[in-house]
């Protein structure tokens, strides 16, 4: 080495001091040691400044890539993470609501199909489409929105969708309920009647009128229907004005009962006790004792009945007379005597004739005639009896002077009621005798139902007469109170005289 060449060690230390580390920060210079630098160390090649900057740039890029990779591995806790989570939650909520709507539709599908209700699939499709459009429009804003705002949006979407599904389901169920009630009402003719009876108490006249209206509404395009109408008790009872008189009697009884309650509420003390005692005595008369029909002797003629019923009406001291009732009763017994003589004549004619078919047809027709006339006679006698009770009640209420007491009138009316019921029982026996005589050659399956029907209608007729008699109780109670008031007002006047 020559003396002109510069020393190598200072050059190496100078270059090293200008280098930077990978972070482009100057490296601290190590402390100088007292030991000499080895002269045999190879001198590193010096690089230009451009090469130094190029080597530092890749180091920075690699450092940034490393940091990004590390950030992916670490769980995110910033605002960006809430966007993807909210989107997933909204999709799950929409799918759940759609499933609920589909479940409701499946539940009512059978009822809708049977009742003809429109299918709710269109409503469900519109709900799903609206939820999808709303989700698509809100996805962009949810990525940058705050978590609380996102939750509010989800709640609104779920609430609106749920309201649509639930309201649609409730409307469908309400329509199903109304349609079901209509179908039940159409399939059950007694549904409306049952509903009406639950709201009010039916009276005897209402029951009879409903039965008559129901019979009139039946189709009459068959011969059997016409025959049934001839033997229908309700239609015949209304034909003889029995239903009208029964309704009028019920009205008078109801008005009288209201007056009795009003008068009793205005009384007090001893006067109230005395009035109640008298009313109880009057009420005991209306308690009809059970009578035995077998002990009743059969009537031999019409004169006895007419005389007895006329005498009873005379004791009432009213202007009405039982002529119509007596005439209807005499007509019935006269027809019975004629029908009893007819089978004997037909039997004699049948022996002379060679054909037995004509005799059987005549006997069969005779049974139908007897049955029809029996029902008609029972309805007519019952209607006439109720008409007499109605007229008696009107005359008692509007009579100017009471010649007999209310207690005496109640006793007379009670005897009359028992007499009418026994006569109806006797009349039904006469009709069954006619049926048995005319249907000797008939089978029991044909004759027994007809006889049973006659006895049944006779029992119903007696019940109707007894019910009409009970309607007279409030009328006679008012009569008793009025007579007592008149007597109390007449006593001071007689004392003054």
Curated annotation (Swiss-Prot):
Outline the segment boundaries, as ranges, of region: Disordered.
1-54, 344-364
Which intervals carry biased composition (Basic and acidic residues)?
19-34
The answer to whether the entry has keyword Phosphoprotein is yes
Annotated source species: Mus musculus
Q: Which family does it belong to?
A: Belongs to the FAM114 family.
Q: What is this protein called?
A: Protein FAM114A2
UniProt modified residues of type Phosphoserine: 84, 205
**Record lineage:** Eukaryota, Metazoa, Chordata, Craniata, Vertebrata
Which gene produces this protein?
Answer: Fam114a2
Q: Which UniProt keywords apply?
A: Phosphoprotein
């Amino acid at each position: 080495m020559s003396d002109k060449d510069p020393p190598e060690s200072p050059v190496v230390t100078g270059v090293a001091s200008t280098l930077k580390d990978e972070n482009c920060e100057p490296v601290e210079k190590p402390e100088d040691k007292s030991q000499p630098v080895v002269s045999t160390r190879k001198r590193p090649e010096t690089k230009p400044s451009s090469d130094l900057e190029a080597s530092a740039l890749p180091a920075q890029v690699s450092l940034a890539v490393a940091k990004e990779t590390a950030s992916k591995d670490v769980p995110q806790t910033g605002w960006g993470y809430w966007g993807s989570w909210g989107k997933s939650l909204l999709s799950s909520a929409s799918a759940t609501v759609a499933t609920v709507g589909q479940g409701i539709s499946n539940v009512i599908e059978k009822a809708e199909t049977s009742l003809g209700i429109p299918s709710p699939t269109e409503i469900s499709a519109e709900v799903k489409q609206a939820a999808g459009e709303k989700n698509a429009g809100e996805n962009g804003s949810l990525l940058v929105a705050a978590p609380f705002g996102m939750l509010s949006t989800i709640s609104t979407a779920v609430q609106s969708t749920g309201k649509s599904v639930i309201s649609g389901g409730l409307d469908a169920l309400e329509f199903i309920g109304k349609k079901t009630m209509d179908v039940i009402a159409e399939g059950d003719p007694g549904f409306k009647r049952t509903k009406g009876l639950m709201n009010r108490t039916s009276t005897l006249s209402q029951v009879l009128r409903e039965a008559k209206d129901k019979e009139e509404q039946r189709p009459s395009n068959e011969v059997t229907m016409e025959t049934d109408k001839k033997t229908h008790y309700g239609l015949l009872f209304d034909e003889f004005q029995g239903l009208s008189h029964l309704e009028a009697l019920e009205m008078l009884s109801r008005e009288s009962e209201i007056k009795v309650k009003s008068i009793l509420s205005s009384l007090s003390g001893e006067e109230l006790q005395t009035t109640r005692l008298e009313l109880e005595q009057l009420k005991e008369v209306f308690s009809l004792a059970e009578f035995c029909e077998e002990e009743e002797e059969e009537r031999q003629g019409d004169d006895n009945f007419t005389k007895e019923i006329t005498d009873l009406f005379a004791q009432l001291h009213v202007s009405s007379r039982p002529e119509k009732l007596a005439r209807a009763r005499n007509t019935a017994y006269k027809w019975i005597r004629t029908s009893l003589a007819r089978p004997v004549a037909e039997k004699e004619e049948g022996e002379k004739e060679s054909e037995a078919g004509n005799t059987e047809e005549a006997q069969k027709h005779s049974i139908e005639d007897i049955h029809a006339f029996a029902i008609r006679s029972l309805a007519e006698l019952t209607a006439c009896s109720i008409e007499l009770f109605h007229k008696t009640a009107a005359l008692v209420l509007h009579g100017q002077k009471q010649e007999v007491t209310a207690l005496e009138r109640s006793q007379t009316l009670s005897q009359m009621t028992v007499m009418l019921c026994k006569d109806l029982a006797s009349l039904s026996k006469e009709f069954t005798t006619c049926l048995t005589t005319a249907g000797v050659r008939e089978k029991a399956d044909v004759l027994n139902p007809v006889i049973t029907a006659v006895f049944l209608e006779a029992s119903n007729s007696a019940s109707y007469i007894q019910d009409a008699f009970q309607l007279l109780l409030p009328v006679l109670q008012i009569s008793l109170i009025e007579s007592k008031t008149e007597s109390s007002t007449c006593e001071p006047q007689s004392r003054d005289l």
